[in-house]
């Protein structure tokens, strides 16, 4: 066969083999084009897992009529124009292959309008030579791309497509990843005419955790440690889950972004894994959502056609920077300082995201105020990342006024010879997770009871009862109100006059519990609930709570928290060993009084002596 130039359609189909792997690949390329066009809202409509229809609609800047034909041509792009642009890419797309490749293996229609145009125009390519036809259309400012019958002309590729559910799950994962990268854009994902995902745009940093919880789930949000780390031109932001409380489900959450581009990079994963290796088991993986910002000239994006990988010009520097950033946050978790009564406590800094995920900031036993103050983190020179390193996860002690003077006074006091004085009274040791424990979980009995071994005795513990006590502790406000979590879609309910009066009387108490609402003539709108209620069926629970309040003459936060704890649905109809161990660890940490004096219905000793005596008499 002689050497010949391939027809345009065949050449595009060959390129599609690298770019268009499955429907999710199409969604990724088209949504990234929408983001590059400055869209603030992107609607994704899918039918039959993307095999029948993929429609991407955005409100971006649109494409001019005279550029529509070029948009469907190979190697035509508005992102780069020279080698200098290629070496400093800031856009998501730049190859100019996506639309041409997709149109060669599907029936693609491109409709767009710019703000300067009075009407929209529609373009589509067909035939062996991929000739583009342009005609007038009706469309608002922005762009809509419809991809029909993906792989209709490449049967071999269509055979490799999975089930409709599997393909849509891949699309759902792609939208999750993109939504985590662009908090300022609204994403709506529909499948077979039904809205499946809606991620609303958030503007403020404090609201980013709202989307983080919606995408990654409440368990990750509860254990998330915020990171803000910088050195020179490198910046690392995001969240990493506390390795001490990382579960198997959380290990699937591993998202990293380089200059806003989602990546699967071994170097980044290795740096994070190395920082967490002392706290992770051999079969555990870290969970994280991290954003690395670097000078575009220091990273090569033009490595893989699908742009999943990058190369760093100073890979060792990037690796060590990420390692130090993650390690510093984890070290701050475990470091404590020597309590010195001579030093006045520094002003408390309560970050937006909890520094010590899972630490009890709800109800705590009565103790001196100084004991409840969290220890100020110590500066660790080995995790500084150089003089340019900084960290916003907590206030540094040397940043407080008069710190150096206080340290000098303490140092001189330590050097003085103590005078003879009576021996101090013994102080009871602080309660920690090792000194007080329910014991070791041996097995699960009956699906909802844990068989425990502690100090040579066997006991049976009711897991639903333990979970109820944990929920009550999480819902009971301590020194500060329970943190309210805004609902993505507020719950609007119709209430009677008595119920409305009861809500108004208990509004301040409900606010302390993290339940925020607004009321009008005959309705109440629930806008926020505490974190333990985010996964509950609020359309059932909240009306029952309102009915309970309407029957009460007096209100107390303890009683309301107790009622909610008794009426929430358990997250585990059938308990596993891992779930039981995690629950008991939380109960031991948040409800230490239950370990000392277990209430009725929680713990039941198992009489092994009677059984042993019966066996001896056989």
From Swiss-Prot:
The keyword Iron does not apply. Residues 367-381 have a biased composition (Low complexity). GO terms for biological process: mismatch repair. Keywords: DNA damage, DNA repair. Residues 367-403 are annotated as: Disordered. The keyword Iron does not apply. One of its GO terms (molecular function) is ATP binding. GO terms for cellular component: mismatch repair complex. This protein is involved in the repair of mismatches in DNA. It is required for dam-dependent methyl-directed DNA mismatch repair. May act as a 'molecular matchmaker', a protein that promotes the formation of a stable complex between two or more DNA-binding proteins in an ATP-dependent manner without itself being part of a final effector complex. Belongs to the DNA mismatch repair MutL/HexB family. This is DNA mismatch repair protein MutL. It comes from Salmonella newport (strain SL254). The lineage of its organism: Bacteria, Pseudomonadati, Pseudomonadota, Gammaproteobacteria, Enterobacterales. The gene is mutL.
């Amino acid at each position: 066969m002689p050497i010949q130039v391939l027809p345009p359609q065949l050449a595009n189909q060959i390129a599609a083999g690298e770019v268009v792997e499955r429907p999710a690949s199409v969604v990724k390329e088209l949504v990234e084009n929408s983001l590059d066009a400055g869209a603030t809202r992107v609607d994704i409509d899918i039918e039959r897992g993307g095999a029948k229809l993929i429609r991407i609609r955005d409100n971006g800047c649109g494409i001019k009529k005279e550029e529509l034909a070029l948009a469907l041509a190979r190697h035509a792009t508005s992102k780069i124009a020279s080698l200098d642009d290629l070496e400093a890419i800031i856009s998501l797309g730049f190859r100019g292959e996506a639309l041409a490749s997709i149109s060669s293996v599907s029936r693609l229609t491109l409709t767009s309008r710019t703000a300067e145009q009075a009407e929209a125009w529609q373009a589509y390519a067909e035939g062996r030579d991929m000739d583009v036809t342009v005609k007038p259309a009706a469309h608002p400012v922005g762009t809509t791309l419809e991809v029909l019958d993906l792989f209709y002309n490449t049967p071999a590729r269509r055979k490799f497509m999975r089930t409709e559910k599997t393909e849509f799950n891949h699309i759902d994962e792609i939208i999750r990843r993109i939504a985590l990268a662009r908090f300022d854009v609204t994403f709506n994902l529909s499948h077979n005419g039904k809205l499946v995902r809606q991620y609303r745009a958030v503007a403020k940093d404090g609201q980013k955790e709202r989307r983080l919880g919606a995408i990654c789930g409440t368990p990750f949000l509860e254990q998330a440690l915020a990171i803000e780390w910088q050195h020179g031109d490198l910046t690392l932001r995001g969240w990493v889950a506390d390795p001490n409380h990382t579960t198997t489900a959380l290990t699937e959450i591993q998202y990293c972004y380089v200059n806003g581009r989602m990546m699967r990079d071994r170097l980044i994963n290795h740096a994070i894994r190395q920082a967490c290796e002392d706290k992770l088991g051999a079969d555990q993986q870290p969970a994280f959502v991290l954003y690395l910002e670097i000078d575009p000239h220091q990273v090569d994006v033009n490595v893989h056609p699908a742009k999943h990988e990058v190369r760093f010009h100073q890979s060792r520097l990037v690796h060590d920077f990420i390692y130090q950033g993650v390690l510093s946050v984890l070290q701050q978790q475990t470091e404590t300082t020597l309590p010195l009564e001579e030093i006045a406590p520094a002003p408390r800094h309560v970050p937006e995201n909890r520094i010590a995920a899972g630490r009890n900031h709800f109800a705590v036993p009565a103790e001196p105020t100084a004991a409840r103050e969290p220890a100020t983190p110590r500066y660790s020179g080995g995790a500084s990342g150089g003089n340019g390193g900084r960290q916003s996860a907590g206030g540094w002690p040397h940043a407080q006024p008069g710190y150096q003077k206080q340290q000098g006074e303490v140092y001189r006091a330590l050097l003085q010879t103590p005078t003879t004085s009576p021996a101090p009274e013994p102080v009871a040791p602080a309660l920690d997770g090792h000194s007080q424990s329910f014991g070791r979980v041996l097995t699960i009995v009956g699906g909802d009871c844990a068989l425990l071994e502690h100090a040579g005795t066997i006991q049976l513990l009711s897991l639903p009862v333990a979970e109820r006590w944990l929920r009550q502790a999480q819902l009971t406000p301590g020194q500060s109100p329970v943190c309210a979590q805004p609902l993505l879609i507020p719950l609007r309910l119709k209430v009677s006059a008595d119920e409305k009066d009861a809500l108004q009387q208990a509004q301040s108490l409900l606010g302390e519990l993290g339940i925020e609402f607004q009321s009008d003539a005959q309705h109440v709108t629930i806008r926020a609930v505490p974190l333990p209620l985010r996964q509950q069926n609020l359309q059932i629970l909240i009306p029952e709570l309102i009915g309970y309040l309407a029957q009460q003459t007096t209100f107390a936060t303890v009683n309301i928290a107790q009622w909610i704890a008794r009426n929430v649905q358990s997250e585990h109809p059938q308990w596993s060993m891992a779930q039981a161990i995690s629950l008991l660890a939380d109960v031991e940490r948040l409800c230490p009084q239950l370990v000392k004096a277990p209430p009725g219905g929680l713990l039941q000793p198992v009489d092994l002596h009677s059984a042993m005596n019966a066996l001896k008499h056989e």
